[in-house]
């Protein structure tokens, strides 16, 4: 569960986020809609601990994102608007690197990678350099990184950007599947 309480992000006199409060329950799919500059990405960056709020509180599974950042982040898989990919790595190398960063036990990594590659339809791309992938496939690699370890909470910032209409449907179906099946 995520609880956002009176969240404020101010840049000088401009409010990017102005006293926003909401709760997202386990298994719930929750989205932000709004025009460019409405504070959607800013809110997600605060929720994941990548940006500090001016005021307010974010609790992730009961952990305050500022007071217990490691415990809170361990519950979150995050796909930012622009996935932080390493173009000189293969898909598999990158995901193994991410598994190590996420402290997934070594003996579980191969199984985790196999599952994530299958869910994101990247099995045939695992040996390819990320630099040689289309934008749609790079987006899938970012999504695979976010769901690696099957975190309780997955935060996706524009997960279907760069995907063709068929891939958009597949990713939305995957998100619904994860909401139903992720422990």
Residue spans for each PLM region:
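Conserved ABC transporter NBD signature motif
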Residues: 56-67, 71-72, 76
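Conserved ABC ATPase "signature" region
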Residues: 96, 100, 107-125, 176
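Hydrophobic anchor residue at the start of the ABC signature
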Residues: 143
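A short, proline-enriched helix->beta-strand linker immediately N-terminal to the Walker B motif
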Residues: 148-152
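Catalytic Walker B motif of ABC-type/P-loop ATPase nucleotide-binding domains
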Residues: 154-158
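Helical segment within the ABC ATPase nucleotide-binding domain
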Residues: 169-181
């Amino acid at each position: 569960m995520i609880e956002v309480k009176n969240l404020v992000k101010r840049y000088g006199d401009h409010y990017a986020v102005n006293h926003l409060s909401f709760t997202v329950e386990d298994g719930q799919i929750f989205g932000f809609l709004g025009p460019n500059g409405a504070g959607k990405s800013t809110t997600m960056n605060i929720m994941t601990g990548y940006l500090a709020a001016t005021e307010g509180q974010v609790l992730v599974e009961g952990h305050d994102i500022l007071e217990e950042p490691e415990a809170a982040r361990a519950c979150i898989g995050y796909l930012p608007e622009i996935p932080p990919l390493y173009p000189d790595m293969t898909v598999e190398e990158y995901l193994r690197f991410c598994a190590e960063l996420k402290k997934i036990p070594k003996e579980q990594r191969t199984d985790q990678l196999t599952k994530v590659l299958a869910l994101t339809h990247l099995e045939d791309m695992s040996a390819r350099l990320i630099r040689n992938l289309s934008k749609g496939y790079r987006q899938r690699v970012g999504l695979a990184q976010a769901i690696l370890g099957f975190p309780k909470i997955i935060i996706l910032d524009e997960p279907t950007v760069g995907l063709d209409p068929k891939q958009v449907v597949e990713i939305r179906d995957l998100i619904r599947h994860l909401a139903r099946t992720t422990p």
